[in-house]
């Protein structure tokens, strides 16, 4: 059995060695331009069209939780990957815990008013502020997949009122579920902290815009952990200037790296990180990939396959 591997930044030699240890009966090679030799599986991130086009693969594994870069490429180069070839994404592989850490730490940061105290410190002002109550600090999660469920689970332990919004209704204990566009307004109007974990699809691009932000309570917060294209950055800045939003924490941006001229860099109520909220953990990823390949070879049911029509 042959596996081809491609990632523009990962240490390919390390991955090849680790995969061959996990799958001793398999030969793994780093794909390079001009390599047209047969392969059974491909492990990729932002692969060139020529890597996959025309191959009779058993499956392709994206080396991340999102597959939007591959699906976007397929829109313009449908020959890149035959529709009959299953496409898999990394389901969790350590990303759930990372998202939990990020979301909980940021919600608590806002809840305890550390941003306000930092602003006072910058002015050399000693001033205790009124506390927020949990009842007025409802957290709403857009996107109810594996990562969304993990974040909800971790926040529940801290006693915050929780709600989620997704394409279909969920039955999560202790979480109010809203589904579909017809219930979006009801979801938003009591959401003090909006956490975005939506997949990147044609339906979700630009969803966090002026219209949506205006439906949040005044002095709300936005935490974007999904994709930069979900947020209209000009509308977000306008909402911060008007006071509709009290703060924003952004891990992803419409253009990455974020251009130096972006006003987001200089806004006092915008905090940011460089797309590191949940990174691929190699050991966990290899365990999932090797297990799934073995299941596929035995004809057993598997999880993590992407529905190309839905985009996730």
From Swiss-Prot:
The keyword Oxidoreductase applies. The active site is at residues 227, 275. Its EC number is 1.1.1.79, 1.1.1.81. It is found in: Cytoplasm. It comes from the Bacteria. Gene3D superfamilies: NAD(P)-binding Rossmann-like Domain (3.40.50.720). Keywords: Cytoplasm, NAD, NADP, Oxidoreductase. GO terms for molecular function: glyoxylate reductase (NADPH) activity; hydroxypyruvate reductase (NADH) activity; hydroxypyruvate reductase (NADPH) activity; NAD binding. Catalyzes the NADPH-dependent reduction of glyoxylate and hydroxypyruvate into glycolate and glycerate, respectively. Belongs to the D-isomer specific 2-hydroxyacid dehydrogenase family. GhrA subfamily. This is Glyoxylate/hydroxypyruvate reductase A. The lineage of its organism: Bacteria, Pseudomonadati, Pseudomonadota, Gammaproteobacteria, Enterobacterales.
């Amino acid at each position: 059995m042959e596996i081809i591997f491609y990632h523009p930044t990962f240490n390919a030699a390390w991955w090849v060695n680790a995969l061959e240890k996990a799958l001793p009966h398999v030969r793994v090679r780093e794909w390079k331009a001009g390599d047209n030799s047969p392969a059974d599986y491909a492990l990729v991130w932002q692969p060139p069209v020529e890597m996959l086009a025309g191959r009779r693969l058993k499956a392709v594994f994206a080396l991340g939780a999102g597959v939007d870069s591959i699906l976007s490429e397929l829109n313009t180069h449908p020959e890149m990957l035959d529709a009959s070839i299953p496409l898999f994404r990394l389901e969790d592989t350590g990303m759930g815990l990372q998202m939990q850490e990020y979301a909980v730490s940021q919600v608590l940061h806002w809840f305890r008013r550390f941003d306000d105290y930092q602003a006072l410190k910058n002015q050399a002002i000693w001033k205790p502020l009124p506390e927020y109550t949990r009842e007025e600090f409802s957290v709403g999660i857009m996107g109810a997949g594996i990562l969304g469920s993990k974040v909800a689970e971790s926040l529940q332990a801290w006693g915050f009122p929780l709600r989620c919004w997704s394409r279909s209704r969920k039955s999560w204990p202790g979480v109010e579920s809203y589904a579909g566009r017809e219930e979006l307004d009801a979801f938003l109007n009591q959401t003090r902290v909006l956490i975005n974990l939506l997949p990147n699809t044609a339906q979700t691009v630009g969803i966090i815009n002026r219209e949506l932000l205006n439906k949040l309570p005044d002095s709300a917060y936005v935490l974007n952990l999904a994709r930069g294209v979900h947020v209209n950055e000009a509308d977000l800045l306008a909402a911060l200037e008007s006071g509709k939003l009290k703060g924003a924490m952004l891990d992803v941006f419409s253009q990455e790296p974020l251009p130096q001229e972006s006003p987001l860099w200089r806004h006092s109520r915008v905090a940011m990180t460089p797309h590191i909220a949940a990174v691929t953990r190699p050991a966990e990823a290899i365990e999932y990939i090797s297990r799934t390949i073995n299941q596929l070879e035995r004809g057993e049911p598997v999880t993590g396959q992407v529905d190309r029509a839905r985009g996730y």
